[in-house]
Swiss-Prot record:
Chain's gene name: rplF
Keyword Lipid metabolism in annotation: no
UniProt-listed Gene3D superfamilies: Ribosomal protein L6, alpha-beta domain (3.90.930.12)
NCBIfam families tied to this protein: L6_bact
GO cellular component, one term: cytosolic large ribosomal subunit
UniProt keyword annotations, A-Z: Ribonucleoprotein, Ribosomal protein, RNA-binding, rRNA-binding
Protein name: Large ribosomal subunit protein uL6
Similarity comment: Belongs to the universal ribosomal protein uL6 family.
Database matches in InterPro entries: Ribosomal_uL6-like (IPR000702), Ribosomal_uL6-like_a/b-dom_sf (IPR036789), Ribosomal_uL6_a/b-dom (IPR020040), Ribosomal_uL6_bac-type (IPR019906)
Length: 178
């Protein structure tokens, strides 16, 4: 069995689970999330735990088993604690500011870049170069962070760009003159 999939998922107090066929809905203090579980995988609530099981040991079912358990676990974590990704901007003249609920970046382009906050995502800015993305859906928070990072990827020669907090950029040595 999958080491990830066979571990039961603890359901903390204040979280309600609604299983309707292949759809799992999780309600908690921070909001509601729902996810469709792939067809051969079943989710059952046993007391204060959720058990994810598969019908047989076919290769596809084994691969979906751990995935399904992780999706359910991430939903429970999201509605109880939420997810936050902190990011930093490096570079002369690069900055970020909050415009209403949206982020406005100055990244060396001829125009400012505006990132709109989708439903369920909140932005926070700390100074001109640090900001955070928060929400209850781990996939959505990570995707927004990746999209923002893609606006100005780190330059390996000068170290300029947008990066995750604590991320180390591998620097390259530039050309040497004659």
């Amino acid at each position: 069995m999958s080491r990830v999939g066979k571990a039961p998922v603890a359901v903390p107090s204040g979280v309600t689970i609604n299983i309707n066929g292949q759809s799992v809905e999780v309600k908690g203090p921070k909001g509601t999330l729902s996810q469709d579980i792939p067809a051969p995988i079943t989710v059952a609530q046993e007391g204060e735990e959720l058990v994810v099981s598969r019908p047989d040991d076919h290769r596809k079912n084994r691969s979906l088993h751990g995935l399904s358990r992780s999706l359910v676990f991430n939903m429970i974590e999201g509605v109880t604690k939420g997810y936050t990704i902190n990011m930093e901007i490096f570079g002369v003249g690069y900055r970020v500011q909050l415009k209403g609920k949206n982020l406005e970046f100055a990244l060396g382009y001829s125009h400012p870049v505006l990132i709109e906050a989708p439903e369920g995502i909140t932005f926070a800015v700390d100074g001109n170069t640090k900001f955070s993305i928060a929400g209850i859906d781990k996939q959505q928070v990570g995707q927004i962070a990746a999209n923002i990072r893609r606006l100005r990827k780190d330059d390996p020669y000068k170290g300029k760009g947008i990066r995750y907090e604590g991320e180390q950029v591998r620097r390259k040595v530039g050309k040497t003159g004659k």
